[in-house]
């Protein structure tokens, strides 16, 4: 379950990059405490996870979610089947899928803030931020249809929660067409860290 109020089935950048950041933070804390074996374990998991995400989730423009439905609903305890996307995990609705998520690099943003360095290949991070501006930015909201909550109107510009430049799932996650300032902030700060000043300040 995640901050989009949905269950994502399969590896996705938002949770994956948070995980990489947690591994790096745990490594640093373990080294400080003299727990070198645990630090090495965290580093090994981080390096393997980083390589896997860059190789498997980066599509050349941004990181995307690989939807992996369960083969059998009984693989998850019934008490954990809550919220959107939980009705039938063998055919889950409300998934991100191939969308360009506004805060897919939120873990990278926090890693920079905490001095933990890059969690992914820097060239991929920079390209992803450019893609977020390319696909998610709306200069105004006049022609934008949103069947959910509206937090920007008229001539206000904003970054959509997600865009679908190639294909969209039949039932994407519910908030994809909304805009939310906090999520925009993580993308903007990420752009500033990468020297994309004009985009970040926009």
Report the location of each language-model feature:
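Hydrophobic, small-residue-rich alpha-helical packing segments that form membrane-like cores
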Residues: 1-58, 68-72
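Well-ordered alpha-helical scaffold segments within catalytic/enzyme domains
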Residues: 18-36, 103, 107-120, 185-196
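Extended glycan-interaction surfaces of carbohydrate-active proteins
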Residues: 1-10, 54-180, 202
């Amino acid at each position: 379950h995640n901050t989009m109020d949905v269950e994502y089935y399969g590896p996705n950048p938002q949770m994956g990059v948070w995980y990489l950041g947690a591994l790096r933070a745990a490594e640093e804390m373990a080294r400080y405490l003299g727990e070198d074996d645990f630090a090495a374990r965290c580093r090994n998991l981080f390096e393997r996870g980083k390589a896997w995400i860059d190789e498997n989730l980066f599509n050349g423009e941004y990181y995307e979610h690989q939807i992996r439905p369960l083969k059998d609903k009984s693989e998850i305890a019934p008490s954990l089947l809550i919220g959107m996307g939980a009705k039938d995990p063998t055919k889950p609705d409300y998934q991100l899928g191939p969308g360009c998520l506004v805060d897919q690099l939120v873990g990278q943003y926090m890693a920079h803030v905490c001095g933990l360095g890059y969690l992914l290949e820097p060239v991929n991070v920079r390209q992803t931020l450019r893609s977020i501006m390319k696909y998610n930015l709306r200069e105004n909201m006049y022609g934008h249809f949103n069947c959910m909550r509206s937090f920007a109107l008229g001539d206000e510009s904003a970054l959509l929660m997600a865009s679908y430049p190639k294909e969209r799932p039949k039932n994407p996650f519910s908030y994809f067409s909304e805009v939310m300032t906090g999520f925009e902030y993580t993308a903007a700060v990420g752009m500033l860290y990468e020297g994309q000043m004009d985009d970040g300040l926009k």
